[in-house]
Amino acid sequence: MDTVTSKELPTLGLGLHFEDLPVGRAFRTIGRTITEPDIVNFINCTGMTEVLFTNLEFLKHESDIKGRLAPGSLVYCFAEGLLVHATMQKTGYAFLGMTLAIENPVFAGDTIHVEVAVTESRRSKSRPNRGIVTTLNRVVKQDGTTALTYTPTRMIKARGTGEG
């Protein structure tokens, strides 16, 4: 260690480049358990204070949903958080759009992970040092059920311009 400077050490945890994301590449993230404090903090931070998320008596007696329900937007945000740590540090330039479908509820105590498959990948015509990548992302609960799916398109840093 004495002969290696800090700047010479490789940095772990950096994102994937455009060239690392060809069509067909697939991977999954680590898991993350959704807790009751996560839900309470999220609904208070976002102002999503509808009774479905804030009133346990309503859930017990007036709703067919039983248990502390997580808003779909919380599940999406946590999925993106799992992906940022795994794939986009210093390489993600822009979020360009997506479609999203909520398929099953997530409750406090559920653990989610994200399964990702690259469906489109091309070098940007106007910015050849970047790529445009679309993925199919499935947020999966511990029992194997899909909570939500979404298809983000992102601008990702490339290692080079693709010339030469």
PLM segments and residue spans:
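HotDog/MaoC-like acyl-thioester-processing domains
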Residues: 1-22, 102-111, 115-164
